[in-house]
Amino acid sequence: MTHKNILLTIIFGLFMIILSACGMSNKEMAGIDNWEHYQKEKKITIGFDNTFVPMGFESRSGDYTGFDIDLANAVFKEYGISVKWQPINWDMKETELNNGNIDLIWNGYSKTAERAKKVAFTNPYMNNHQVIVTKTASHINSIKDMKGKKLGAQSGSSGFDAFNAKPDILKKFVKGKEAVQYDTFTQALIDLKNNRIDGLLIDEVYANYYLKQEGNIKAYYFVKTAYQGENFVVGARKVDRRLIEKINKAFKQLHNKGKFQKISYKWFGEDVYSKE
C-alpha cells in the first residue's frame, strides 16, 4: 500500500469514527424517518424555553411544568414513549433541531412561513395573538401612542419576526425604529416594570398568565396589534413525517377522550383546542 493510500485510509477511518460518534445525534444527516428509533428507545428529546409560562417553564422547586409539558407528556404516553425536556436558547431552536441536539421544538412555537423553510409542523393545537403590554399609568393605549417610545421584544420570537417583517404596523412608530432584544420575556417584563422600556411586544397567552400570577395585572394594559393571529404547533425535522402524523393523531385522541380539555382547564380555565 502506498503512502498516499495509507493516508487516505486513515482519513476515511477518522471520518467514520466521527460519523459513528455522531450516530443518531444528527438524524437529519441520515435523511431517514426516525419514528421506529423513538419507539425502540422509548424516549424523545424536546427543546423548550424554560422561562415561557404557562407553556413550559421551570418551577421554583426546579421541576419542569406548564401546559405544553403536560400536553407533550400525554401525547407520548399514548405511544409508551417518555419525554426528556431540554432547555435551549430559543434564538437557536431550529439549529438545535436540525443539528440533532433535540427531536422536537415544543413550547408556544408559532407557525410562520419563514420557519416552514427549516422545519415541518404538526397541525395547530392552540391559537395566540401578539399584544403590546404597557403600564396603565403610562397611558399608552394604542400603537400610535408608542411613537418615540422604547419597545422590547424577545429575540427569535414570532412577535419580533413580525415586528421586522411588517414595519408599517409598529416598527415605524417606536424609538429608533427598533426593539430592545431580550433572551427571555421574564427579563423584558422586569425592565417594563422598572420603566426601562415603555412597551413589550409579547404573546398574549404568556402575558395574561404571567401578570395574573404576579397579582398585578391591573397595573398593565394590553394594546391589540394588527399582526395576524398565530397558531401554536410542534416543530420537527422535515424527515420525521411519521412523528408528525403520530402527534396529530394523539391530539385528536386526547381531545376525544377529554384529556386535552382537562389539561387546558388546568392552565387556562377553558378549552383552547384549535379547531383548524
Language model: regions and residue ranges:
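C-terminal motif of bacterial Sec signal peptides marking the signal peptidase cleavage site
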Residues: 18-21
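Extended ligand-binding regions for polar small-molecule ligands
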Residues: 23, 69-78, 144, 149-150, ...
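Extracytoplasmic small-molecule ligand-binding "clamshell" domains
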Residues: 26-108
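Flexible hinge/capping segments at coil-to-helix
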Residues: 37, 134-151
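Periplasmic-binding protein-like
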Residues: 50, 127-134, 204, 212-252, ...
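Ligand-binding cleft/hinge of the Venus flytrap
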Residues: 58-59, 72-81, 159-181, 211-216
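Short helices/loops that flank or line small-molecule/ion binding pockets
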Residues: 86-87, 91-104, 118-120, 144-147, ...
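A ligand-binding cleft/hinge motif common to bilobed small-molecule-binding domains
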Residues: 92, 109-117, 162-165, 190-194, ...
